[in-house]
């Protein structure tokens, strides 16, 4: 499914335990409509040892967030994204203030 967000966009989290935080989109799962935001929605994961010499360990990892719970964040404003054509090119812009992204 098409999304208006791209990898590398700064987003603000709207819901959940990290509400109000901002971060960069690391990856997008277009099939399940989830995004992974850098340093947000952290969970602990147990990694088992692969060999008898290694030890099992607990790592912190970013968990996916539903795409409806994030909004593009630019110049201190969180806004929805729109598209407009300028010089036969499709451009993204913030709907709140009309700024190009």
UniProtKB/Swiss-Prot annotation:
Annotated keywords: Ribonucleoprotein, Ribosomal protein, RNA-binding, rRNA-binding
Pfam families with a match to the protein in the record: KOW, ribosomal_L24
Gene3D superfamilies: 2.30.30.30
Keyword DNA repair included in the entry's annotation: no
Ribonucleoprotein found in the keyword field: yes
CC per GO annotation: ribonucleoprotein complex; ribosome
GO biological process, alphabetically ordered: translation
SUPFAM superfamilies attached to this UniProt entry: Translation proteins SH3-like domain (SSF50104)
GO molecular function, one term: rRNA binding
Coiled coil: none
Family note: Belongs to the universal ribosomal protein uL24 family.
Family matches, as PANTHER family: MITOCHONDRIAL RIBOSOMAL PROTEIN L24
Physiological role: One of two assembly initiator proteins, it binds directly to the 5'-end of the 23S rRNA, where it nucleates assembly of the 50S subunit. One of the proteins that surrounds the polypeptide exit tunnel on the outside of the subunit.
Subunit structure: Part of the 50S ribosomal subunit.
Protein name (record): Large ribosomal subunit protein uL24
Organism: Borrelia turicatae (strain 91E135)
Taxonomic classification: Bacteria, Pseudomonadati, Spirochaetota, Spirochaetia, Spirochaetales
Gene that encodes it: rplX
């Amino acid at each position: 499914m098409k999304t208006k967000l791209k990898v590398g966009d700064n987003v603000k989290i709207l819901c959940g335990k990290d509400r109000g935080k901002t971060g960069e989109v690391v990856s997008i799962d277009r099939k399940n409509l989830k995004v992974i935001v850098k340093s947000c929605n952290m969970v602990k994961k147990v990694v088992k040892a692969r060999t008898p010499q290694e030890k099992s360990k607990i790592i912190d990892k970013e968990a996916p967030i539903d795409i409806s719970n994030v909004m593009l964040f630019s110049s201190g404003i969180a806004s929805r994204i729109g598209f407009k054509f300028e010089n036969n090119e499709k451009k993204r812009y913030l709907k709140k203030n009309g700024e190009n992204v």
